[in-house]
Structure formats: C-alpha cells, structure tokens
Amino acid sequence: MNQNRSLFAKLADGSLVLQIILGIIAGVALASFSPSSAESVAFLGDLFVGALKAIAPILVFILVAASIANQKKNTKTNMRPIIVLYLFGTFAAAITAVTMSFLFPTSLVLVSGAQGATPPEGIGEVLNTLLFKVVDNPVNALMTGNYIGILAWGVGLGIALHHASENTKTVFADVSHGVSQMVRFVIRLAPIGIFGLVANTFAATGFEAIAGYAQLLAVLLGSMLIIALIINPLIVWFKIRRNPYPLVFTCLRESGVTAFFTRSSAANIPVNMALCEKLDLHEDTFSVSIPLGATINMAGAAITITVLTLAAVHTEGIQVDILTAILLSVVAAVSACGASGVAGGSLLLIPLACSLFGISNDVAMQVVAVGFIIGVIQDSAETALNSSTDVLFTAAACEAAERQAEI
C-alpha cells in the first residue's frame, strides 16, 4: 500500500512536461506497432479534453467574479496594455503571413468543398455574432462555453459583489481556490490524455493525407514559427527590456505543448491559468486576460486565413498589389479576433477574405476543404501559438507594469 502511495506521489510531484513527452513517445510507438490498439485508447484523450472543457467555463466565471469582488481600491489590472498586445500581435501575424506568401507563392490542387459548412456573409455578421454572445443567457453561456458571455456575466457579478460583506467575498474566494484545485488535478492527467490523443491521431491519419500539401504547410508553420520565435520575443523585449526568450520558451513548453495536442484554446484556459500562478502573476489580471485572450488573441488564426486566402489567389492567377495585401492583413486580423464567434473557427473565415479578390464561394469552400485536410497539423500549431501567446503577453504586461512602478 505504501509502495503504491509512493509511486503516485512520485508521479504527482514529477515533471509534468517530461511526463507529457513520454506520453507523446508512447502514443507514437503504439500507433506505429498496433494502429487498432491506438484507436482503442482514443477515449483517454477524449476524456482529458472533455474534463478540461467542462471545468474551464466555471473556472473562468468564478475566478473573474471572485477577483473583481475582492479587488482592492486603486489596484491596477493592466488590461489595456494586454489588449493592445493581443491586437498588435494578431495584426503582426497577418503581415508576416502576407510576406511569407509573397516570398513562397503556393498553388493548391483543389478538392471538393467542405460539406455542411456555412461561412459568414461578411465581417458585420462576425462582429454581430460576437456582440450577441455578450448578452447570452449566463447558464447557456456556461453550458456552451461562450467565454465572451461568461466574461461579461463574471465581470458584472464581480462588480455587483464588490460592496458585499467580507463573508460573501470570502465564500467566493474559497470557491475560487476549490475550483483551482480541481483544475490542478485535471492538468496532472495531461500525460495520459495526450497519450490517447497522439495515439489516435497517428493511427487514424498518419501523414499520408497531408504529404501532398507540404509547401502550404511549410509556409503556414514557417509563419507561425517566425511569430513565436522572432516577432513575439521582439514585442516582449520592447515591453520588459530584458532577454525575452526564457519567458517565451516557458510559455511554449508549458502552454503550447498541451494546446498543440488538445487543439482547443478553451480547453487550455485552465493550463494557462495554472502557468500564470506559477509565474506569480496578479490574479486580478490573468483571471480576465487569459479567457479574453482565448477569444480575441488569434495570431495563428490570422496566419491561417491569410496564407490560405493568398494560396487561393495564386491558384486563380490573380495579381495582388501592396495596398490590397495590407487590406487583407487588416481583414484577416479583425476576422481572426472574431474566429471564436464562428462555428469552424478560422477556416470558415477564409471565404470572407477570398471575397476581397472576387474569388467565387465555390472555390473558397474548396480551399476550406484543403484546410480541413491539413487541419491535424494546422489547427494544432495554430492553437499552440494562440494559447501560449495569451500567457506570454499577460506576463510581459505584468512585468512591465511592475518595472514602471519601481521607477
């Protein structure tokens, strides 16, 4: 019995990143030697992602309400600089994707269109959807994972309870800590969940289906790597005025790896919040900025929209001037910020961007279908970039504010 306890204690206290790496290796090995067995453990990944998605909405709601209710007077949350970083980072990603697409023009072998997919008719529809998400029924927002609505109601309840008795505030703070403990338990299950996700992905898909789109993937992933390893560190250095790479690699390692395999910014919210606590960031700040980032900080989505749209443009033989390319960057950045308001995310915003160049909806939907084919890598990398950047920019803004306060 004591031996079993010591084994569990070692697992609980061991390096989570190392355990995740072992889970990845085990998943690849199982898929290589026994694909049928690999598919049978897919439920482990589904359970892990399901648990994260289940706990994330209530975590966000309780944390936001508790942090605002317990916020002391004259406490700065640094939200304005974080939002500026989110928006600037998304626009920089779109510009980078345009540059890469011009340097390495890609043509597509188009397939049949994505079935059952309904793209938004324009940017107005995307923004309209986001606006109505704010006034969603709070119970429905929690049930459906509508983080815009959850944030709005959490902020509203927090403000309403700001003048409540200390006992009431203490109850909310205690519930917040309790939910956080549940999140830590779920996150410790990440190695098992990622083992199931990796095994199933390799067994069901492999790399045969995406081998024909190697150049497109190279442009997509190259753009994302440039943002993650060059542009984002430059932005962070500008804010904190020191070597940004230790922080960058911490965020990529502890947030990006999990996000890559869960392929869900919402599911990665608890992971990001735990990382923010580990980095000793201000809870009043990250309890709002992390779920907000999961909604509007979409550098990866901006890259996907831009690269696939320009691939369609090159396929159709359309000439693009600089002004149109800049306009595409703006549209891609704004659309990406609304990607959470569209079923299907960034891929279904491609027809909207394609309409700038007069590309028919039929062709645009074929490009969307290509996106679904390469989605196993594209969506994973996009989510990893989006989610890890949420923590990175939050940490940069908090550190910059602390440095200014000391001056």
Curated annotation (Swiss-Prot):
An individual GO BP term: serine transport
User: One of this protein's Pfam families, by short name?
Assistant: SDF
Source domain of life is Bacteria
Q: Tell me, what is one Gene Ontology molecular-function annotation carried by this entry? A: neutral L-amino acid:sodium symporter activity
For membrane topology, the record states: Multi-pass membrane protein
Record carries keyword Manganese = no
The protein's location, in the record's own words, is: Cell inner membrane
Reactions mediated catalytically: L-serine(in) + Na(+)(in) = L-serine(out) + Na(+)(out); L-threonine(in) + Na(+)(in) = L-threonine(out) + Na(+)(out)
Give the matching PANTHER family.
PROTON/GLUTAMATE-ASPARTATE SYMPORTER (PTHR42865), SERINE_THREONINE TRANSPORTER SSTT (PTHR42865:SF8)
UniProt-recorded name of the protein? Serine/threonine transporter SstT
Query: From which organism does this entry originate?
Result: Shewanella loihica (strain ATCC BAA-1088 / PV-4)
